[in-house]
Amino acid sequence: MAKKITAYIKLQVKAAQANPSPPVGPALGQHGVNIMEFCKAFNARTQGLEPGLPTPVIITVYSDRSFTFETKSTPASVLLKKAAGLTSGSARPNTVKVGTVTRAQLEEIAKTKNADLTAADMDAAVRTIAGSARSMGLNVEGV
């Protein structure tokens, strides 16, 4: 018989840097999950990623307090800020442009995000990422 699911927890945790402090500890603790077990498993799974990049994770908690988790790719906004060398996007994206990204950079980000995007092909994925860049106040070259 399948285990009964009691909760889904969505968090963004820095890759290879999960620890029991907030936000991880309180979110898992209120559902009775072994926090250190999650931290060790998450850090092991994200070892290949660049340390410190925010990584979305969806944790499924079962009635016996066991859990499974699925990691997603880093948010496009974080990758775009990194590609453009920025710390934040524009406060007024339609009027104030804060940086520029090229098609090559967009293709690299689209390859990273491809598993999480619903785009039919790579060109559609690049256009999706380009739309995110424009909404952050970045100029897009070559698209």
Swiss-Prot record:
One GO term in the molecular function aspect is: large ribosomal subunit rRNA binding
Q: Which ranges form a coiled coil?
A: none
Q: How is it modified after translation?
A: One or more lysine residues are methylated.
An example GO CC term for this entry is: cytosolic large ribosomal subunit
InterPro entries per the UniProt record, alphabetical? Ribosomal_uL11, Ribosomal_uL11_bac-typ, Ribosomal_uL11_C, Ribosomal_uL11_C_sf, Ribosomal_uL11_CS, Ribosomal_uL11_N, Ribosomal_uL11_N_sf
Entries under Gene3D superfamilies matching the protein: Ribosomal protein L11, C-terminal domain, Ribosomal protein L11/L12, N-terminal domain
GO BP annotations, alphabetical order: translation
Keyword terms, alphabetized? Methylation, Ribonucleoprotein, Ribosomal protein, RNA-binding, rRNA-binding
The record's listing under SMART domains reads:
RL11 (SM00649)
Q: In the UniProt record, does the keyword Methyltransferase occur?
A: no
- What do we know about how this protein assembles, alone or with others? Part of the ribosomal stalk of the 50S ribosomal subunit. Interacts with L10 and the large rRNA to form the base of the stalk. L10 forms an elongated spine to which L12 dimers bind in a sequential fashion forming a multimeric L10(L12)X complex.
What is the role of the protein in this entry? Forms part of the ribosomal stalk which helps the ribosome interact with GTP-bound translation factors.
State the family it belongs to: Belongs to the universal ribosomal protein uL11 family.
Protein known as? Large ribosomal subunit protein uL11
Q: Which organism is it from?
A: Pseudomonas fluorescens (strain SBW25)
Q: The organism's lineage?
A: Bacteria, Pseudomonadati, Pseudomonadota, Gammaproteobacteria, Pseudomonadales
Originating gene:
rplK
